[in-house]
Amino acid sequence: MKKLFNFNKKTIVATCYGVVLFTLFFRYVKVPTGFPEVSIQTAYGIGAFFAVLLGPIGGAFVAFMGHTLSDVIQFGPPCWSWVIASGVAMYITGLASSKLKVEEGEFAIKDIIIFNIYQVVGNLLAWCLIAPGLDVVMYGENALYAFEQGVWATLPNIVSVGVIGSVLLGVYFRIRGR
């Protein structure tokens, strides 16, 4: 089994790049959904790409720090319930890295399916359970509203990761395989 994270210069630098890209995309490249405080976040496609390259711990760190920095820039204090959920979603997505052959440059239909199974599970858990559950516990949010907001966030995040993440990984694997 692959390591959860390789602590070396290359992965530390790549993680920092991931945090910066995630922050910028999370803050500036999003599409409103019509539900309050829920957008189609292109950043999760970027986060998933880094999660597969760096492993689950690197992916969780990219999303956790990127979401935190974006919230601090935009609002002041971060919404910790959603920041934690971002980290969990990318941690679970990053678990797919042990099933994919990143270094060999292979990314076939089977690999796309495996990647998307992991990201769907991660997004469902993060946005349908963790974020709304923590909203209720940490902030005293109305449970119905919190879980409805979580459900509204789930599908756009699944689509964002499914499309953007799959395309980025496909391009990376093609280039890497040469």
Q: Residues of each region from the PLM?
A:
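Membrane-embedded alpha-helical hairpins and interfacial helices in multi-pass inner-membrane proteins
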Residues: V29-Q41, F75-S81, E104-R178
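Short, flexible micro-motifs
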Residues: L54, G58, V62, G66-L69, ...
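Alpha-helical transmembrane segments in multi-pass membrane proteins
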Residues: A14, G18-F22, G47, A51, ...
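Broad structural signal for hydrophobic residues in well-ordered alpha-helices, predominantly aliphatic
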Residues: F50, L69, A96, L134-D135
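Generic N-terminal initiation segments characterized by hydrophobic and/or small/turn-forming residues
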Residues: M1, F22, S97, K110-D111
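Structural signal for the C-terminal ends of transmembrane alpha-helices
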Residues: L53, L95-K101, G170-R176
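Hydrophobic transmembrane alpha-helices
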Residues: M1-L53, I57-F61
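Interfacial aromatic-anchored transmembrane helix boundaries in multi-pass membrane proteins
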Residues: T23-S39, F64-S97, E148
